[in-house]
């Protein structure tokens, strides 16, 4: 039986921390779907199609990883793919408090829904999309924070 998971996020933009979690998930699961949330309510810096493209470029060459956009409930997206496991990255205790609430809410919507929490490596633990956006707004260098495949897209 194939073990599959979904790694959802806004990825505004995708960071080395996200990519780190994806690479860790690939070691555990046979198939990983990176699900890019439309998330209009978050007022993303980058458009939906741009974010999907950035994630696609970032995971090129990773076996058994695919990228899809979604604009519905995560649980509904998961059911449509017959996958009941989601991966979430944790950097700090504050992340866990938020993610635990989301995990419980998803489980309330679908009792078979499981959330697996993975930590990025220490060198990527401080990286967040918010930090990257802040550095970009101030014309700073984000080359150490994001996958090299998307660096040119961020500066464009």
Swiss-Prot record:
SUPFAM superfamilies named among the record's database cross-references: Nucleotidylyl transferase
UniProt-recorded name of the protein: Phosphopantetheine adenylyltransferase
Naturally occurring in which organism (per UniProt): Campylobacter curvus (strain 525.92)
Function of the protein: Reversibly transfers an adenylyl group from ATP to 4'-phosphopantetheine, yielding dephospho-CoA (dPCoA) and pyrophosphate.
Binding site for substrate: 10, 42, 74, 88
Key words of the record: ATP-binding, Coenzyme A biosynthesis, Cytoplasm, Magnesium, Nucleotide-binding, Nucleotidyltransferase, Transferase
Subunit-level organization: Homohexamer.
Cellular component, GO, one term: cytoplasm
Compartments it resides in: Cytoplasm
Upper lineage: Bacteria, Pseudomonadati, Campylobacterota, Epsilonproteobacteria, Campylobacterales
């Amino acid at each position: 039986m194939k073990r599959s998971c979904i790694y959802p996020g806004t990825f505004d933009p995708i960071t080395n921390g996200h990519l780190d979690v994806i690479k860790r998930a690939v070691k555990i699961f046979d198939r990983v779907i990176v699900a890019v949330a439309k998330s209009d309510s978050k007022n993303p810096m980058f458009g939906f199609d741009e974010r999907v493209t950035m994630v696609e470029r970032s995971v090129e060459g990773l076996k058994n990883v695919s990228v899809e956009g979604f604009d519905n409930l995560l649980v509904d997206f998961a059911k449509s793919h017959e996958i009941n496991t989601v991966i979430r990255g944790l950097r700090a205790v504050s992340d866990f408090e938020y993610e635990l609430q989301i995990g419980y809410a998803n489980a309330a919507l679908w009792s078979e829904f499981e959330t697996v929490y993975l930590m990025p490596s220490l060198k990527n633990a401080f990286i967040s999309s918010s930090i990257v956006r802040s550095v970009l707004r101030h014309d700073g260098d984000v080359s150490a924070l994001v996958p090299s495949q998307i660096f040119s897209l961020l500066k464009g």
